[in-house]
């Protein structure tokens, strides 16, 4: 599989291990940055866009009480803008789950 095709996958991100030891006032902003970093690493795109619902979920318990885990859908898409520097971008959106137990990475069928 090449990193130049559009694809959608579901991942669980353990934010607790990425934020452990972080100052309280930096936790929610760092969580957003860590989700972007995770998406860049996994999808191989520099341009990562966070969905509004995912951002609200990360900030839902305040600046210092970030959820331990978050389930996200990462969609790599083609950039329609002609003069864009990056040909592909990634959209990170929230997936609501009752429990994180037993979940694995899975490919989502494209629309």
Swiss-Prot record:
Transmembrane segments: none annotated. GO terms for molecular function: structural constituent of ribosome. It comes from the Eukaryota. Keywords: Ribonucleoprotein, Ribosomal protein. Belongs to the eukaryotic ribosomal protein eL31 family. CDD domains: Ribosomal_L31e. The keyword Ribonucleoprotein applies. This is Large ribosomal subunit protein eL31.
């Amino acid at each position: 599989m090449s990193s130049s095709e559009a694809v959608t996958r579901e991942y669980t991100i353990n934010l607790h291990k990425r934020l452990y030891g972080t100052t309280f006032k930096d936790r929610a902003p760092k969580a957003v940055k860590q989700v972007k970093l995770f998406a860049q690493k996994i999808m191989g795109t520099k341009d990562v866009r966070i969905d509004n619902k995912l951002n609200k979920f990360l900030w839902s318990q305040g600046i210092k009480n970030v959820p331990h885990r978050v389930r996200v859908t990462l969609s790599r898409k083609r950039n329609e803008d002609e003069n864009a520097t990056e040909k592909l971008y990634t959209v990170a959106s929230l997936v609501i789950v009752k429990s994180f137990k037993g979940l694995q990475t899975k490919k989502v069928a494209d629309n």
